Amino acid sequence: MEPVKLNSSEWNVLNCLWENHPRTVMQLVADLEAAVGWAKSTTITTLRRMEEKGLVRAEQAGRGKAYTPAVEREQAVTAETHSFLDRVYQGSVGLMMSAMARRQELSADEVAELRAILDQIDGGDGT
C-alpha cells in the first residue's frame, strides 16, 4: 500500500474520526468548529476531497452521510514520522531522540517507556 501523506486539514478530520466514528456531517461540523474554528463549508469541502482521495468512507445514514476513516491511525502516523525523520534529521533516529530528549525533560515513566521500546527492538532483557 502506498504511504499516506496527509495535509493539516486532513489530519484535523481524521483525528476527529479516529476518536469517534461514524460521524455525520453535522457532527463533524460541530467537532471541527470547536477544535479548529472551521466553517460548515470548509468541513464539507474537506470531506468531499478526502472521500475522492479515499481517505474517508461515506455511507448513507438517513437523510445524510455518516463518515468513517478509511486510513488507520497507525499507518498515517508511521508515514508522517518517516517523512519528518527523513526531512529534518536525514533519517537519523538517534539524532532526533537526542534533540527531543535535550529539548524537554523526560519523566521517569517516559524514560522507562523508551528503555522498554529499545529492549524490545534489541531483543534484550533490560540488563
Question: Model-found features: residue ranges?
Answer:
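Short helix-coil junctions and helix-kink-helix linkers
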Residues: 30-38
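Short, cationic-aromatic polyanion-contact patches
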Residues: 3-9, 61-80
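Short acidic, hydrophobic short linear motifs in intrinsically disordered regions
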Residues: 23-31
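Short, hydrophobic-biased segments on the C-terminal half of alpha helices
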Residues: 44-48
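Pre-recognition alpha-helix immediately N-terminal to the DNA-recognition helix
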Residues: 8-16, 27, 95
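Glycine-centered, phosphate/nucleic-acid-interacting loop/turn motifs that mediate DNA/RNA or nucleotide
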Residues: 54
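Amphipathic alpha-helical dimerization/coiled-coil segments
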Residues: 78-124
